[in-house]
């Protein structure tokens, strides 16, 4: 099979540059395009050079339609508005769309779901192997423990992150809720402040910390009577997300239309 030709959306950002490096060093994939916002000062620059690699000949562009003429997929770690704009073009072109963008709303998710009858989409709040294994563990632990164990999720990221809770924290919250057989939306508690009253049994709490250059720390706490279980993942480099996203793209190339998660990619969906 020929190399998978991938477009990197948000190519000038930190994740975009990590993706360019990951694709360049992985057999079976090539950078076919580098997408940036129309207002970016980086348009026209070489994608390889921006990623700290030798020049690749691929220039940053704001025209996804033109970039996608001969591409097989797009890997998208941008912002919700950009991702939703990319969804229709990716579906129309028949490209695999790997979405790692966080901060998506319910209406954004509905737009993404609307194309999956004809498009192959992999969407996850976190693309790393470790976090997705953690989510599987969280689901199993939540299934095993009753409401006597309170669930709290604590996450910390660098000071430039613009959304909270993180997509990973929400992924872990969904895993905990699934383990308990409930809907996260009905039990999620965020941003406690002031006199909140006693904690209700069954709540799933979130606390978000921001500061420094932290790539991503997540801890799921199961606090019971006189004992506490803590499950933690610490990301030390964005390359774990880049390699996970690339693995998802290569896997999705052989799948039919549908909406998939990293649990599907890693064979964890039945855990």
Swiss-Prot record:
One of its GO terms (biological process) is diaminopimelate biosynthetic process. This is 4-hydroxy-tetrahydrodipicolinate reductase. InterPro entries: DapB_C (IPR022663), DapB_N (IPR000846), DapB_N_CS (IPR022664), DHDPR_bac (IPR023940), NAD(P)-bd_dom_sf (IPR036291). NCBIfam families: dapB. Keywords: Amino-acid biosynthesis, Cytoplasm, Diaminopimelate biosynthesis, Lysine biosynthesis, NAD, NADP, Oxidoreductase. (S)-2,3,4,5-tetrahydrodipicolinate binds at residues 158, 167-168. It catalyses: (S)-2,3,4,5-tetrahydrodipicolinate + NAD(+) + H2O = (2S,4S)-4-hydroxy-2,3,4,5-tetrahydrodipicolinate + NADH + H(+); (S)-2,3,4,5-tetrahydrodipicolinate + NADP(+) + H2O = (2S,4S)-4-hydroxy-2,3,4,5-tetrahydrodipicolinate + NADPH + H(+). The active site is at 157 (proton donor/acceptor), 161 (proton donor). The keyword Amino-acid biosynthesis applies. One of its GO terms (cellular component) is cytosol. It comes from Rhodopseudomonas palustris (strain BisB18).
